[in-house]
Design a protein with these regions (language model features):
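Extracytosolic helix-loop segments that constitute the early lumenal/periplasmic catalytic or substrate-binding loops
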Residues: 64-91, 95, 103-111, 257-263
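Transmembrane helical bundles and short interhelical boundary loops of multi-pass, membrane-embedded
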Residues: 1-12, 18, 39, 46, ...
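Specific aromatic-rich, kink-prone transmembrane helix
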Residues: 135-138, 175-192, 353-354
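Hydrophobic alpha-helical membrane-interfacial segments at the cytosolic entry of transmembrane helices
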Residues: 43-46, 229-254, 372-376
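Short helix- or helix-capping micro-motifs
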Residues: 47, 152-158, 199, 203
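Perimembrane helix-loop-helix junctions
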Residues: 212-245, 349
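Transmembrane-helix motifs of polytopic, lipid-linked glycan transferases
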Residues: 18-22, 119-143, 305-315
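Aromatic/glycine/proline-enriched transmembrane-helix motif characteristic
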Residues: 28-31, 35, 110, 266-337
Length: 412
């Protein structure tokens, strides 16, 4: 626990120093004179090597890594069609199984084991983390210099919460998060057609992506119906939206449509608990791993409806493109904090979205929210990985972080 606390302290001091001595003065001077792509290339390379080394030397979360290694071998050896019929635990939709098939093939070809195997299994998530940082750089580059844009990207590339998630834990939240970021980026750029396919891929990788459905609906309302509406535009968007659904069906075919439907329904119904190690409202109340009742199930839905209603209010109140990123972060973080059946890592996409909101409209509140959500996610994932696995009864309640984060979100 001391190591976790020291990492938080160091990260907070580093973030404060970066803001005070670089970002804030650079924003005030608003200088955009350098044009050197080597900045982002160097930062991305260092972040990639760091993640790869950490991924190789530390196995990760025992249960999750065992699942990914086992699934990669099973899907490669048995094929897509038999995977969901095997007598083994599997709670992921088919999207990531395509990735694990390639991982399994490489593992069999080269006979990787131990550190090399750990790094290989974590590699897709690591690559997606780096690409998310590059996307943040791309968005920032529209307004700022290469140097400052790289600093913004580095706030994500070297974020301790993102490093722990993919490199140490071995989870794949960064994979579907990349497609969430791309979906919302395309919506903010009024490129709705691309966003439909990004959303389809998100859903195909992780059903938690359904949380972001309101963002896609907001984009359709604003970019298809409100701005320059025409029958041709509507039909074009409808056609590509249907095409995205057809893509999902085609990708599901090798696994068997009925198997995929069963997998989604089983996954959505799994973990019927108030919270699963999440540092949220239910965790702060001491309800970790407590089973759902009819009453708490209704309360969870009430919270979810309230969150969506609040996101509608915030979205249509805002007047700039950063609202897409901010409302996406709001949906992710508020759902994680208030809804039931939430896991420790479910607020992960909020970090990248808040950073994109900040670089789009450099409001200091966005930076503070990014720091608080990072603090919450790092504490949660690091605690589960390094403390909880060894002492499951030692549950840490993060009420101060929860309260501070909720106040700033609600005061928006």
């Amino acid at each position: 626990m001391l190591g976790i606390s020291l990492t938080v302290l160091f990260s907070a001091l580093a973030a404060f120093a970066v803001w005070s001595y670089y970002i804030n003065p650079a924003l005030k001077s608003n200088v955009k004179k350098d044009n050197n792509a080597m900045y982002i290339i160097a930062a991305a390379a260092v972040a990639f090597i760091l993640r790869l080394i950490l991924g190789a030397v530390y196995r990760g979360h025992n249960t999750d890594m065992s699942c990914f290694i086992g699934w990669s071998n099973a899907v490669f050896e048995n094929g897509f069609g038999k995977f969901y019929t095997l007598d083994m635990f599997h709670d992921y939709p088919p999207g990531y199984m395509y990735v694990l098939y390639i991982v399994g093939a490489i593992e069999k070809l080269f006979g990787f084991s131990d550190g090399a195997q750990y790094a290989l299994v974590k590699l897709p998530a690591i690559v997606c983390d780096i690409l998310a940082g590059v996307l943040i750089y791309k968005v920032a580059k529209k307004k700022f210099s290469d140097g400052l844009s790289t600093v913004f990207a580095s706030l994500y590339l070297f974020n301790p919460a993102t490093v722990v998630n993919c490199s140490l834990w071995g989870q794949v939240d960064s994979v579907y998060t990349l497609f969430i970021l791309l979906m919302i980026y395309f919506i903010s750029e009024k490129k709705m057609i691309y966003s439909y396919f990004m959303f389809a891929i998100c859903i195909f990788i992780k059903p938690q992506a359904f949380i972001f459905t309101p963002i896609l609906i907001f984009g359709i309302i604003e970019n298809v119906f409100i701005k320059d509406f025409s029958k041709e535009k509507l039909l074009k968007n409808l056609g590509f939206g249907v095409s995205a659904i057809i893509l999902m069906v085609l990708l599901a075919l090798p696994f068997g449509i009925s198997n995929v439907i069963d997998q989604y329904t089983t996954t959505m119904a799994s973990y019927p608990y108030l919270t699963v190690n999440a540092f949220n409202l239910w965790g702060a109340l001491g309800k970790n791993w407590e089973g759902l009742s009819s009453f708490t199930t209704v309360i969870g839905y009430v919270f979810l409806i309230a969150i969506v209603a609040y996101s509608v209010y915030v979205f249509f109140k805002s007047k700039n493109n950063a609202k897409y990123y901010f409302v996406g972060a709001l949906l992710a973080f508020m759902t994680y904090m208030l809804s039931t059946k939430m896991h420790d890592r479910y607020a992960f996409p909020a970090m990248g979205l808040l950073l994109l909101a900040f670089v789009s409209v450099t409001d200091f509140k966005n930076f503070i929210m990014y720091a608080l959500v990072t603090l919450s996610q790092f504490f949660n994932t690091a605690w589960v990985l390094f403390v909880y696995e060894k002492s499951p009864n030692d549950y840490f309640r993060s009420a101060p972080v929860l309260i501070a984060s909720l106040i700033i979100f609600l005061a928006r």
